UniProtKB/Swiss-Prot annotation:
This is Cobyric acid synthase. GO terms for molecular function: ABC-type vitamin B12 transporter activity; catalytic activity. Belongs to the CobB/CobQ family. CobQ subfamily. GO terms for biological process: cobalamin biosynthetic process. Pathway: Cofactor biosynthesis; adenosylcobalamin biosynthesis. It comes from Synechococcus sp. (strain CC9605).
Amino acid sequence: MTGASPRPLMVLGTSSGAGKSLMTAALCRVLQRRGEQALPFKGQNMSNNAWVDADGGEMAYSQAMQAWAAGLEPCCSMNPVLLKPRGDSTSEVIHGGQSVGIARAEHYYRDWFRPGWKAIRTGLMQLQQQWPQGRLVLEGAGSPVEVNLQRRDLTNLRLAQYLRANCLLVADIERGGVFAQIVGTLSLLRPVESPLIKGILINRFRGRRELFDEGRRWLEANTGVPVLGVMPWLNELFPPEDSLDLLERKPTRGATDLEIAVLRLPSLSNFSDLDPLEAEASLRLRWIQPGEPLGEPDAVILPGSKQTLRDLEAMNSCGLADQLRAYAQAGGSVLGICGGMQMLGRSLSDPEGLEGTDQRCSQNGLGLLPLETTFSGTKRLSQRSIDGLWPMETPLSGFELHYGTTIPDAGLQPLSSDPGLGWWAPGPKGSSVVGTYLHGLLDNGPWRRAWLNRLREQRGLQPLANDPKNHSAHRDLLLDRLADAFEQHVNLAPLLQP
């Protein structure tokens, strides 16, 4: 840490899901408003919700969002260690944006602690060299006081001590037990760590803040740590970071013009692709787990998958595959993204075992598009800018993040000027089956609106206006609303002390 840099800030949480990611994003946007250059950083993240930076490096989507909040383009130095769970007690390990191996849970800290700490220090050095006057805004992971893991901690208090960061402890009051969470966390800190905690933040409080005044006084009297703020319930501003948290989301809209079903398969990844649809007031998303009925939605989306063959097997075993075939044959529209597109094809082959299955295998797909996919070679990681051809001619941007090569039958219509990036086929009653490798396709406002208007036409509804903005504009508005609430409800002065 250079002497010219302002003191780093760190957002810790009493548990997973406490709201660390959003509070870190809020801090980044508030500092940007005050003329500071915030530098978001999470040493190690575990997530299958990923982003690809301009140099082809892979990082967690939550750090990309924090970069946008800070007015920066995301770069993988902001998240130098990314673990991508594969569902079998193993994770793909990403260091500096590139895949470096597969780790088993029981051996991770034995085999990967030293390389991970080296990658974290390298990421910090790269950020500080590029922005020497910037202020690091760090996000912790889970709880900082998991006693069995403290000796090998990579991203919480080890990092806070290393950088002498001023720490804010966030606790989620919505889930109950907030006093025990806070007191328990503070009591488990080691003496050298306790002075790093400069304040407590109560998150997701419902009702008038005055109702928590007695709780604030009790916490300050019994812990000696000031409560710097009480943030109101803002959970619907952004979708959750963890796919498990999708199970807790309840529909917030009443009657809408359209309903789109999204298959929440066991190895769901990159569900941030659905954020633009979450923001569309004219529709609602209904997440479907294996075993639940498909119903009669206006469209079905198969998102990305970390384990495509296993998710396809899950669909077959619970009858969801047969339901989807019948739905498409009856005139239902289907959109598959990345692994979802691969499942829509005729066959999937994994001769090198890249999918992590017990044996190299081939498997029949859903047969809704004439595609043959082979998992081989290296992972494709790149940002893309291309010309869309269907359902309208419009510029498209996004990124590729996948293993595998997909070959279409001759005559299948390409989705864009890159004939290997996606395809579409017409179905009965004006429906369509669409598949693409382009993550972020729905972020493109004109494309999204044209696709939704085709669904509306199937329903006999009037089209929506053809002047939609890209989702980045809506996301920026939400970040401003988040920062507005943070500035209103949180006293930052103790946290910003040198």
